[in-house]
UniProtKB/Swiss-Prot annotation:
Source species: Bungarus multicinctus
GO cellular component: extracellular space
Domain BPTI/Kunitz inhibitor: 29-79
Protein name per UniProt: Kunitz-type serine protease inhibitor homolog beta-bungarotoxin B6 chain
Major location category of this protein: secreted
Family label: Belongs to the venom Kunitz-type family.
Keywords: Disulfide bond, Ion channel impairing toxin, Neurotoxin, Potassium channel impairing toxin, Presynaptic neurotoxin, Secreted, Signal, Toxin, Voltage-gated potassium channel impairing toxin
Disulfide bonds: 29-79, 38-62, 54-75
Amino acid sequence: MSSGGLLLLLGLLRVCAELTPVSSKDPYCNLPPDPGPCHDNKFAFYHHPASNKCKEFVYGGCGGNDNRFKTRNKCQCTCSEYP
């Protein structure tokens, strides 16, 4: 791995460490993906607890629940046990 890649990885790990609560992951990380009642077709990410991975789904743009993230990285930092 190049030194630039290593620095990027270390930076991401630091961000995850700052964003991840020490106690445990947030309870909404176990909720199923909810597209909501609207039909805007935006791509978002949700935490899939059985696989401990963040997966993409289509969000309608309104409503839904809190297990919804704009980026995979934010989802992993918030919900994954091992980001």
